[in-house]
Amino acid sequence: MLIQKIKTYKWQALASLLMTGLMVASSLLQPRYLQEVLGALLTGKYEAIYSIGAWLIGVAVVGLVAGGLNVVLAAYIAQGVSSDLREDAFRKIQTFSYADIEQFNAGNLVVRMTNDINQIQNVVMMTFQILFRLPLLFIGSFILAVQTLPSLWWVIVLMVVLIFGLTAVMMGMMGPRFAKFQTLLERINAIAKENLRGVRVVKSFVQEKEQFAKFTEVSDELLGQNLYIGYAFSVVEPFMMLVGYGAVFLSIWLVAGMVQSDPSVVGSIASFVNYLSQIIFTIVMVGFLGNSVSRAMISMRRIREILDAEPAMTFKDIPDEELVGSLSFENVTFTYPMDKEPMLKDVSFTIEPGQMVGVVGATGAGKSTLAQLIPRLFDPQEGAIKIGGKDIREVSEGTLRKTVSIVLQRAILFSGTIADNLRQGKGNATLFEMERAANIAQASEFIHRMEKTFESPVEERGTNFSGGQKQRMSIARGIVSNPRILIFDDSTSALDAKSERLVQEALNKDLKGTTTIIIAQKISSVVHADKILVLNQGRLIGQGTYADLVANNAVYREIYETQK
């Protein structure tokens, strides 16, 4: 997959390889020219020194320029590949259902799209900057070193075997450690994210010490993994250098006697030592890159898990159509992923177009679950849900989204403007449509008090608005598309009694033909509904008007009595 991404930048990659070739040629020629300069100096051929020296400087300049261009090209390729991977991953995540998101965990996905892709980006960068250069430099330096002093070939082989052997052992040991490191990084990110989002709860219940202890436990474990990896490499790198410098010392000691009989051999020794140093450099860099490559391989596997994941739900690839606003549940049973007990059990009911229907029940009765099944955020394991007489699994996503709109209990706004947030409900919503939706949601008053009205900025998560204002904008977003079925999942809970009453009056007046489903904790929110559904422990145990249920349904009557 990574190779396919790099192919997108094939011309930059080819140019980078050309620059790599020039860099290697420069590195291999410089010791040879240095050898010739020393030879000319020792033999008194001073005229040759200038011409050879000019070539030496020219070759060095070519290598320097090629190196600079290669850095630019490598950065371009690495940034492009990481951007493409990040976009592919985000695009795939957009196809995930609620169940898929819960399986991966939101914090986990954030780490994969940031830290893991950064690891891959770094390795792609180093691949074009260094990795392609190493085998060419190693082979070229080995051949030229042996050619310069053939009798010392075994010194190079011994050094290479020792260093590569240790590197192979360390790579085998480090792989599991890097995987553990990534897992701990996910956990520490999840804890930090959870605490930052829930800072009010932490402060309210004086949980700072407990949360800090929880964070510290994972942080210490992460530190332990990092220290282990650091200690391991603190042993490996000095050992590599020790072997390398030992090889240099051994080479000089072995040829020391040759200098006395033939002083011109000094140039050969200098050239040999330079080539030996380049061999040491390549091996040390392989060890260094091994660390990064190990991390990147694990990161690549984690990105592939996202890209290769099969969404738990898919929509039919068929043309959009118009559906009427009737709704029916037929023997629906639903269990959340990872749960054993069903949240909804054999639920059946029918709602006619234009009806206002309330859904009540104790906490945990399955009210919000029922609401989330209608826009197909989850699929039931048994039974069928039909809108306009059609199973919602047999219609396109576009059809379902324009037919059903849901206002969630927790108002979530995105950074941008008020208009940007309302247009999430309908992408091409006009100012008139937004005004209408804001009026129904009782949001017009505070929006028009703002200098830029609908173009006023919304900060991340809507932190510059009160809870009630965010909830009213969330309601307006649900209304703006004028859906056939509108669901309120206890979404008026943040409103005061007056605002809630005004919203309900506006809904009755302006959305008369819309099928409205109100999930409510308070009986007063659904007292005027055409029909009320009563849920208890996942089962539908009653349905009827307010008066019928007060008279005939014990659970409803109990809720009513506690709220009088």
What are these model-derived regions, one by one?
Residues 7, 11-69, 73, 146-151, ...:
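Transmembrane helix-loop-helix hairpins at lipid-water interfaces of multipass membrane proteins
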Residues 45-48, 58, 144-161, 228-302, ...:
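Helix-loop-helix
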Residues 18, 26, 48, 66, ...:
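Hydrophobic alpha-helical transmembrane segments of ABC transporter permease domains
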Residues 43, 79, 87-111, 115-117, ...:
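Short intracellular "coupling" helices and adjacent cytoplasmic loop segments at the cytosolic face
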Residues 8-10, 95-99, 115-124, 128, ...:
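An intracellular "coupling" helix at the cytosolic face of ABC transporter transmembrane type-1 domains
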Residues 322-564:
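ABC-type nucleotide-binding domain
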Residues 1-8, 109:
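A short amphipathic helical element positioned immediately N-terminal to and/or at the very start
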